[in-house]
From Swiss-Prot:
InterPro entries: EF-Tu_GTP-bd, EF-Tu_GTPase, EFTu-like_2, EFTU_2, P-loop_NTPase, Small_GTP-bd, T_Tr_GTP-bd_dom, Transl_B-barrel_sf
EC number: 3.6.5.3
PANTHER family hit by this protein: ELONGATION FACTOR TU, MITOCHONDRIAL, ELONGATION FACTOR TU-RELATED
Stored Gene3D superfamilies: P-loop containing nucleotide triphosphate hydrolases, Translation factors
Compartment(s) of residence: Cytoplasm
Catalytic activity: GTP + H2O = GDP + phosphate + H(+)
Name of the molecule in the record: Elongation factor Tu
Lineage: Bacteria, Pseudomonadati, Spirochaetota, Spirochaetia, Brachyspirales
UniProt xrefs under NCBIfam families: EF-Tu, PRK00049.1, PRK12735.1, PRK12736.1, small_GTP
Organism: Brachyspira hyodysenteriae (strain ATCC 49526 / WA1)
Record's keyword terms, sorted: Cytoplasm, Elongation factor, GTP-binding, Hydrolase, Magnesium, Metal-binding, Nucleotide-binding, Protein biosynthesis
Entry keyword GTP-binding: yes
Pfam families (UniProt xref): GTP_EFTU, GTP_EFTU_D2, GTP_EFTU_D3
A single Gene Ontology CC term: cytoplasm
Entry binding sites for Mg(2+): T26
């Protein structure tokens, strides 16, 4: 399973591609790995378009009765200063709910916009979702610029993108916008060109530089108690069960005791191995890792549970929360709701139905309102105060909340 050890001598940053379907997110992902692998052949592998796309597709087709897995592809690459783990988020509207957990893994996002098409509905929705799930830094890649007959078109699209960023609370005027063509960069590398001097690769170097300079070094919560939300579960013959996910805080290494918390009764086990990109690591906050668990069957664990230091987090189902209900113009509900409303609550990698009850004299909560609500979930999940969650209904986000008090 392991192929060497990851030497963490560069700052580690999680990023991902967002944007409308067919604007070139997957092509750009492949282009970045192509350019980076040409510059750092010892440590970075080029990932072909088909490999990125296939990973997204294969992970996306799951039993419809289960919580839908994030249809994403994970790749890694380097700049001169940083090591990046990159997730290629799906752009299709059917998969948009997965961005709630997909984008939550990002320290920053690369918004891909086709210079031919300009801003499209999913461009806006992904920017909105990024804001909601706490992605505070976006770098824009204006793709397919080689196909423009009129260079002024790029100016128009750029202005449009800045407006969208400003509208959703990002600073459009300060956001780096890089123009280029992902496919041209791939072709240049395939033709054996030097990425540091070839004009078609310049846009990718500019993009890496923008990621390095615009997205600040992440503040990791390494010193807190270990917690990782389980994204996926695999069985490895002869080795046991592996759970994967992003470490939210603390660190984990071979031999540590852990608890599996939420959805089912809490189980205690020992982590017998930690890996990232097929290399053995000490997992620290921010890393996407796989943890091998001793004596745990594949069917005894599921996505949405958390792996944590024993005794540090407990399962709960009833809590008070401060929520903001999105206005219609923000993509939310057109009408209000009353007590008994049953939407989906998204906590980390869990989506679970909850019954909302209004507090005090409130008769109805309207779009645009801030309110303190009592929520009871149908299943207990690992929860703590100050934890953020999204409220979803009919395939769209209708509100955001933060747990203010755990009741039971």
């Amino acid at each position: 399973m392991a192929k060497g050890t990851y030497e963490g001598n560069k700052t580690h940053v999680n990023v991902g591609t967002i944007g409308h379907v067919d604007h070139g997110k997957t092509t750009l992902t492949s282009a970045i790995t192509a350019v980076s692998s040409a510059m750092f052949p010892a440590t970075v592998q080029k990932v072909a378009y088909d490999s990125v796309a296939k990973a997204s597709e294969s992970q996306g087709r799951r039993d419809p009765t289960k919580i839908l897995t994030i249809a994403t592809s994970h790749v890694e690459y380097e700049s001169d200063n940083r090591h990046y783990a990159h997730v290629d988020c799906p752009g299709h509207a059917d998969y948009i709910k997965n961005m709630i957990t997909g984008a939550a893994q990002m320290d920053g996002a690369i918004l891909v916009v086709s210079a031919e098409d300009g801003v499209m509905p999913q461009t806006k929705e992904h920017v909105l979702l990024s804001r909601q799930v706490g992605v505070n830094y976006i770098v824009v890649f204006l793709n397919k610029c080689d196909k423009l007959d009129d260079p002024e078109m790029a100016e128009i699209v750029e202005a449009e993108v800045i407006d969208v960023l400003d509208h959703y609370g990002f600073d459009g005027s300060k956001t780096p916008i890089i123009r280029g063509s992902a496919i041209k960069a791939i072709q240049a590398i395939e033709a054996g060109k030097d990425p540091r001097t070839d004009p078609d690769c310049k846009c990718i170097l500019d993009l890496l530089n923008a990621l390095d300079t615009y997205i600040p070094d992440p503040v990791r919560e390494v010193d807190k108690d270990f917690l990782m939300s389980i994204e996926d579960v695999y069985s490895i013959p002869g080795r046991g069960t592996v759970v994967t996910g992003r470490i939210e805080r603390g660190k984990i290494e071979k031999g540590n005791e852990v608890e599996i918390v939420g959805i089912r009764p809490t189980q205690k086990t020992t982590c017998t191995g930690v890996e990232m990109f097929k290399k053995e690591v000490v997992g620290i906050a921010g890393y996407n890792v796989g943890c091998l668990l001793r004596g745990i069957e594949r069917k005894a664990v599921e996505r949405g549970q958390v792996l944590a230091k024993p005794g540090t987090i407990t399962p709960h189902k009833k809590f008070e929360a401060e929520v903001y209900i999105l206005k219609k113009e923000e993509g939310g509900r057109h009408s209000g709701f009353v007590s008994g409303y049953r939407p989906q609550m998204y906590f980390r990698t869990t989506d679970v139905t909850g019954v909302i009850n209004l507090q005090g004299d409130a008769q109805m909560i309207m779009p645009g309102d801030n309110a303190n609500l009592t929520i009871e979930l149908i299943t207990p999940i690992a929860m703590e105060e100050k934890q953020r969650f999204a409220i979803r209904e009919g395939g769209k986000t209708v509100g955001n909340g933060v747990v203010t008090k755990i009741l039971e």
